[in-house]
Amino acid sequence: MAKEKPILNVAFIGHVDAGKSTTVGRLLLDGGAIDPQLIVRLRKEAEEKGKAGFEFAYVMDGLKEERERGVTIDVAHKKFPTAKYEVTIVDCPGHRDFIKNMITGASQADAAILVVNVDDAKSGIQPQTREHVFLSRTLGISQLAVAINKMDTVNFSEADYNEMKKMLGDQLLKMVGFNPANITFVPVASLHGDNVFKKSDRTPWYNGPTLAEVIDAFQPPEKPTTLPLRLPIQDVYSITGVGTVPVGRVETGIIKPGDKVIFEPAGAVGEIKTVEMHHEQLPSAEPGDNIGFNVRGVGKKDIKRGDVLGHTTNPPTVAADFTAQIVVLQHPSVMTVGYTPVFHAHTAQIACTFMELQKKLNPATGEVLEENPDFLKAGDAAIVKLMPTKPLVMESVKEIPQLGRFAIRDMGMTVAAGMAIQVTAKNK
């Protein structure tokens, strides 16, 4: 059997009206991942609903409600092959109330494609576009390319394309720490397929790669196998004749039968008997693998979702408190010392209290604007000290980035996102 192509997870980010879903649908169609007949059927459905041009978007917008509203709600995953990779698309929603999905979606991505509407050069960069790029950067995505879409609406004008490219570079990418010189920009018309998989003859002035070629130029992710083992528990099952079977995704390190392990903050210690993925026993599992495993010496009641597994020689850090850099995405009032919202970190959901507001930062450059601010409001970035109200595993992003990022939820919305820059371990 031919060796399988490596998998590359690519997030599609940007404002809701930039044509992300259409770009993705076009990649899937031209990449041979969907039947052309499906597009014909969806085109008819779109036209009947007065949404002509939405047929490609419908491929990703599988949920009926999304089709009627024309927005992408949940994070959808679809695959297509390129010359080099098996690409899994993480189509991230654009609407503000779905930023939580964006946070959980983007954190699974190896690279991101920012889709923008060429016409935004006239109206300015959309706030959502800024937020998505900033979040991707905060969530550790270092590879980015830009698709400047809807080129057909400006008659494939090179001047309009260059204006948009310059505006993005000067007003957004540089500010969040991307070097525009290292980013590939592609002029596309996704609805018609120009420069998506196939070179367009309508952009004779452009001699760069197509969007599919840009994806092939991304570097494959390096699996963090040399970092300490960290496996956040998603669920715990008790299987007759087998025993306790926790399941979760290996974030860092390697797990294999015979390993002596500890679950934190539960403190339960055991030995790995077997490791399974897709009902097959594995000699070992590595980062990215979703596994079930059997542990000797640990009962179902001893551990729960939100616990993190590590080796007894290097146990996960239970935080007494931690200092974090956060960005406030939205908040109806202000955040002050004493505020205690729920933190979503790996698989845990634990309320944490704001103990100190240490510095307010310029969200785009990171420079300090104010020491010890009295409050934080929407749009602010800050360094804060936090204390979990119950035991929580948190690692510093410098040491184990996969376990140092979090979203902060309150009142049914994601109010902030951030990363732990320093963690004080709880004394046992």
Curated annotation (Swiss-Prot):
InterPro entries: EFTu-like_2, EFTU-type, G_TR_CS, GTP-eEF1A_C, P-loop_NTPase, Small_GTP-bd, T_Tr_GTP-bd_dom, TRAFAC_GTPase_members
SUPFAM superfamilies cross-referenced by the UniProt entry: EF-Tu/eEF-1alpha/eIF2-gamma C-terminal domain, P-loop containing nucleoside triphosphate hydrolases, Translation proteins
Location of the region described as G1 in the Swiss-Prot/TrEMBL record: 14-21
tr-type G domain location: 5-225
Region (G5): 189-191
Residue span of region G3: 91-94
PANTHER family reported in the protein's UniProt record: TRANSLATION FACTOR
Protein name according to UniProt: Elongation factor 1-alpha
Organism from which the protein derives: Methanococcus maripaludis (strain C6 / ATCC BAA-1332)
Encoding gene (name): tuf
